[in-house]
């Protein structure tokens, strides 16, 4: 493993552990972004299960023929995830950005989730 990958993995693990300690039992909204798509899921760490998930790979997102790697796709994923979480009765989460900066697609997803009813 290269030094950059090791450092990135350590940072990601550190962020996740801090959130689990300070989460107070709230579910965790975890974000993963690749060069072509963005994924998000609401995870209950106490039970070890995923409560809701959404990604730019879903058929409803791909109908526009646009890429899943832009800010508009991130906003749509955030909105969809918040709706699915609300169906499961989840209103409060802890935001887990992993090793990604709170900027661009990650920020757009978080803002859209907040506007759609999730609080964090």
Swiss-Prot record:
Organism domain of life: Bacteria
Cellular component aspect of the GO annotation: cytosolic large ribosomal subunit
GO terms, biological process: translation
Keyword Transmembrane listed: no
Pfam family, one: Ribosomal_L18p
Region (Disordered): 1-26
Gene3D superfamilies: 3.30.420.100
Biased composition (Basic residues): 8-23
InterPro entries tied to this protein: Ribosomal_uL18_bac-type (IPR004389), Ribosomal_uL18_bac/euk (IPR005484)
Matches recorded under CDD domains: Ribosomal_L18_L5e
GO MF assignments: 5S rRNA binding; structural constituent of ribosome
Complex formation: Part of the 50S ribosomal subunit; part of the 5S rRNA/L5/L18/L25 subcomplex. Contacts the 5S and 23S rRNAs.
Name of the protein: Large ribosomal subunit protein uL18
Organism per entry: Bradyrhizobium diazoefficiens (strain JCM 10833 / BCRC 13528 / IAM 13628 / NBRC 14792 / USDA 110)
Lineage: Bacteria, Pseudomonadati, Pseudomonadota, Alphaproteobacteria, Hyphomicrobiales
């Amino acid at each position: 493993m290269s030094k950059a990958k090791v450092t990135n993995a350590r940072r990601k693990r550190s962020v996740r552990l801090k959130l689990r300690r300070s989460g107070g039992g709230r579910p965790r909204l975890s974000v993963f972004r690749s060069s072509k798509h963005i994924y998000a899921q609401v995870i209950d760490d106490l039970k070890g299960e995923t409560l809701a998930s959404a990604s730019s790979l879903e058929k409803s997102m791909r109908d526009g023929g646009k890429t899943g790697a832009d800010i508009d796709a991130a906003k749509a994923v955030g909105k969809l995830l918040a709706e699915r979480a609300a169906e499961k009765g989840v209103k409060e989460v802890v935001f887990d950005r992993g090793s990604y900066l709170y900027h661009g697609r990650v920020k757009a997803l978080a803002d859209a989730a907040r506007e759609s009813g999730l609080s964090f």
